[in-house]
Amino acid sequence: MMLMAIYHLHCKVFSRSKGQTAIAAAAYRSGTKLEDHELDTVSDYTKKKGIAFSEIALPSNAPKEYADREVLWNAVQEVEKSKNAQLCREFEIALPKELSLVEQIELVRTFAKSLVSEGMIADYSIHDKNDGNPHVHILTTMRGIDDKGKWMSKQKKIYSLDEGGNRIPIIDKKTGQQKISNGRRQWKRETLLDTSWNSKEQLLAWRKRWSDICNEAIDKKNALIEEENLAVNLYAQQEAISHIDHRSYAEQGVNKTPTIHEGWQARKMERLGMTSERLEQNRRINQMNSVWSQLDTLSKKYRKYNEDHYQDYQKEVKSVKQKSIKTYKKRQT
């Protein structure tokens, strides 16, 4: 038996077109009070509970004052001026509750540093209300920082190519020849938005990276658990933690239905004695997954036998289904 670590990584982008601000987003996630210099407003979330840890990671070439959250996100809003500008990206990630806060911080720092190595700034806050749902919010800038500590452009220029994949020369209308400037031949170029950080491929790479980094932390924790278990009796031993997997069940070849994200509001409803449809849906999904798991086990068990055992197989399958129906009906009463 192993403790099941949960994989959840969700990305979204905050933008002006949605009426959002980077200052408000950062203040809420860090549980701080920040002044918005552009709107002349204050976002105060100092009474927000459950902020376990908060920190900003900067590239080595970034201005040191960006370690101040208010300075950083006001600078972002100053450079992202267009009415539909993307202000920041948020990673919302579930943390293994089996890890201590110190271990969770080390895990998040490792992932944040990997993002910073790509040029962005990362502002992250760990939330934990002791409700079994520790998670981290990581806000990252949409632009990188250049060698001079300035914001990089979101655009890039590339050479225009003809159908054969060759660069297209700029022709001087007077001479009919290719233009030359400062001894260099001139070629047609076009400006493109640099959307590499917004690509589906990049998101998949980040999802896998988190899975890999998290599993390394889990392996480290399991090694400690194994060492501690050697020093205690059987009844005091701890369970190891399972790996997480960024792939869907279908991609893993697993016959399971994925659960939906519950969120703190759903769990709060149940603590107050109300019914949460999201939690009920996950219970139904988990029940069906349990049935499929049992049926898969039976299938593997009887696969090596001949047809004489088919009736035994059918009886066990029927038993599993009947137990499942009884459990479901019991929950409805």
Regions found by a protein language model. Give the residues of each.
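N-terminal nicking endonuclease/strand-transfer module with a His-rich metal-binding environment
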Residues: 1-333
